[in-house]
Amino acid sequence: MKRFINSTVTFSVTVTIAVIIFFLLSPVTSLGSGSTYAVVYGSDTVCALISGQPTQRILCYDTRLNINVTLNPGVSFSSIAAGDNFLCGIRSGGYSLLCWDNIGSYSPNRKRIYQNDNVLLETLSVGDKQICATVNGTNSLKCWRGSVSDQSKPPNERFRSISSGVGFSCGVSIRNNRILCWGTDPVKSNQIQTGFGNTPMVTISAGKSHACGLNTTGNLICIGNNDSGQLNVIAPDQPNLYSSSLSLGSNFTCAMRISNNSVVCWGGGAERFNNVTDSISFESISSGPGLICGLISSNLSIMCWNPTNFSRIFLPFPEVLPGPCVESSSSSLCSCGVYPQSDKLCSGTGSICKSCPIQFPASPPSQFPLPPPPPPPPPSPSTSSPPSKALTRGLLAFAIVGSVGAFAGICSVVYCLWTGVCLGKKKVHNSVQPTITRGGSNSRSNSSNSRSLSIRRQGSRMLSMRRQRSGTSSMKHADKAEEFSFSELASATGNFSLENKIGSGSFGVVYRGKLNDGREVAIKRGEVNAKMKKFQEKETAFDSEIAFLSRLHHKHLVRLVGYCEEREEKLLVYDYMKNGALYDHLHDKNNVEKHSSLINSWKMRIKIALDAARGIEYLHNYAVPPIIHRDIKSSNILLDSNWVARVSDFGLSLMGPVLGKDHNPYQRPTKAAGTVGYIDPEYYSLNVLTDKSDVYGLGVVLLELLTGKRAIFRNNGDVEEEEGCVPVHLVDYSVPAITADELSTILDPRVGSPELGEGDAVELVAYTAMHCVNAEGRNRPTMTDIVGNLERALDLCGDSHGSISSGICSIVSD
């Protein structure tokens, strides 16, 4: 029995320790993360915290002018980080944050950014303009400067690691280990956050326009701009090769090897000099846009080099602190021990904690270890001492608790695997389980070779997690949107000339414009002389668009640039979508054959459908609170210069259903609104709104993509007429053909018959569309199910990465 207890205790303790060590992360040093030294952008000045003195002061050295500058000689700091010609430092104790502007001059200007004796700062992150820090104990986030206020960062998030680049900051959320990004450049922030997706991460480091980090399996992942090869990780598939000490510059990435603490770099030609740094062991590394520096372990000196020509220099600093000095009373909290000679380095004022190496939890065993053979009979009770009994009881209790915890963990893993794998075998909807049976030709239609293709759920829960996108922020207008004057927008549109008119929206006319800074935008102007009812509708639509779009940021939603509200004038400014609306391409009278339009391919149409579905899925599942668009139609799906589809026009949008007391979605009673042909019949007749109303609208759009016909059209045999004949609803026209396995009879002839591999994809889209337009909302799939099916359809087209190439452009769907 004792051997079994010891075995179980050992297993439980091992699992417990692995989980604990997993979260003991060593500090990350990069272009935008706090450390004991930093490289200032734009001036090639390096600043460091000097050791061996009563105060851990900041000493800076200008590598171009060869001069030293001391900042606040009588003040101790725990960490510093640099931005564009400025430096910031957290004072020892974390109660104050100071910054110096014009750091390259002889007399930098000092400013106190933060002071609070109760809420202490811990981790510092500085980008080109923005400054962020986490709060000690809570890991909540505070940000300053660069228009990155507390309102623009992810709300109510706690971070275990943060880092800042040029125009963006990113962090690893404690809640789910996902990467969240924010900043003054929402396009770059969203690109990087989207690139990481739902990959569980443990560290993050930012460069000028890319970011890298270690995932939970120990692999290094880099996302963002790759124009110089800075994302081309050396040995990316080899786990536990690199430590958490990463350093990213403008066009290069550097990392430290776990094996010998040497530095390896790639991108911008930096890899040419890896053989020079192979023999040097570093404590950490830090970078500016064009300069790499490392703290050498043997003598705590700083060596810097240029990644393009390896012109290295050794900075004339005394020994530099390898980590912050903590009070001696706190040194007992150093989980991985105290750094050698800490007393000397901190001049008797404290100790330096060693950085803990990141340990990644091994895959849990498939079953509990088998108990060993029965032990020999225990000694008689008279020979057992009371302490041994107590110890045995304690070990037994610990073993039981540990075993229960381990068993619960294994059950969770098994459940996740079961739902992820087995859900893939379920149909799109439990209540409707269609099967597509298709023969190769009429002569073979009844043969045993006909095969079935089921619409699968694709483990929608797992897929949904992989597709999670950026969160929302404040509801206030000015947090994200610029305010323009009416004269600015009038000038941008040629005084709203007819030649600049490109369409109309929920409350006005849309014009193409060009702002003074050269940005191309779309400007929606509300009707000025509207009747009272129309005026109230315009007010509501205007307020809705600002309220929603100012806090929504997603690749597949049209971005609100700003607004204007002067007297009765109400205008909204959006990113200009160069390729217009999907409706215009599908129903253009000049689009008469396959080569008339780039969208006349099944792969392209499925890709556009997937883009739009991802935007709607974000509104339903990840916006807080959820949002129901209410007007999904092909004219509200716009295409940017790269043919990426984005959902637009939120004038009719409403906050979506929330969970009621019975944990079922609450259906919001509201007056029906939308566009004829796309409006949900259940919503129209019952005035009850749910997110399934958007699903219906998307289903009609899918049918448009398949057939090339309008939502309501006049049908004269195989010819669609503008006048005459009886109006036909696209749903009534398409669904019977799909149900009767006659899909080929309604497909858009301009695209032609599906090529090899596309047939199954088109059928999957057709059956997905059929379920989307089911008369009863409860029988329609969720947006997560739809996205999963469209992703699979795009894969079936022979492109697992969702990329579509043509002679004109290259399109990538993430």
Swiss-Prot record:
Sugar-bearing residue positions: N6, N68, N136, N215, N226, N251, N260, N275, N299, N309
Entry's EC annotation: 2.7.11.1
Signal peptide positions on this chain: 1-30
Compositionally biased tracts (Pro residues): 366-381
Gene3D superfamilies the record matches: Phosphorylase Kinase, domain 1, Regulator of chromosome condensation 1/beta-lactamase-inhibitor protein II, Transferase(Phosphotransferase) domain 1
Key words of the record: ATP-binding, Glycoprotein, Kinase, Membrane, Nucleotide-binding, Receptor, Serine/threonine-protein kinase, Signal, Transferase, Transmembrane, Transmembrane helix
Principal localisation: membrane
Domain Protein kinase: 496-794
Transmembrane regions listed in the UniProt entry: 394-414
Extracellular domain ranges by topology: 31-393
Active site positions: D631 (proton acceptor)
Tissue specificity field: Expressed in roots, leaves, shoot apical meristems (SAM), and floral buds.
Region (Disordered): 366-388, 433-478
Compartments it resides in: Membrane
PROSITE patterns per the UniProt record, alphabetical: PROTEIN_KINASE_ATP, PROTEIN_KINASE_DOM, PROTEIN_KINASE_ST
Catalytic activity: L-seryl-[protein] + ATP = O-phospho-L-seryl-[protein] + ADP + H(+); L-threonyl-[protein] + ATP = O-phospho-L-threonyl-[protein] + ADP + H(+)
Residues annotated to bind ATP: I502, G503, S504, G505, S506, F507, G508, V509, V510, K524
Topology relative to the membrane: Single-pass type I membrane protein
InterPro entries associated with the record: Kinase-like_dom_sf (IPR011009), Prot_kinase_dom (IPR000719), Protein_kinase_ATP_BS (IPR017441), RCC1/BLIP-II (IPR009091), Ser/Thr_kinase_AS (IPR008271)
Ranges annotated as biased composition (Low complexity): 441-457
Membrane-side (Cytoplasmic) residue stretches: 415-814
Role: Serine/threonine-protein kinase.
Subunit structure, as described in the record: Homodimer.
Identification of the protein by name: Putative serine/threonine-protein kinase-like protein CCR3
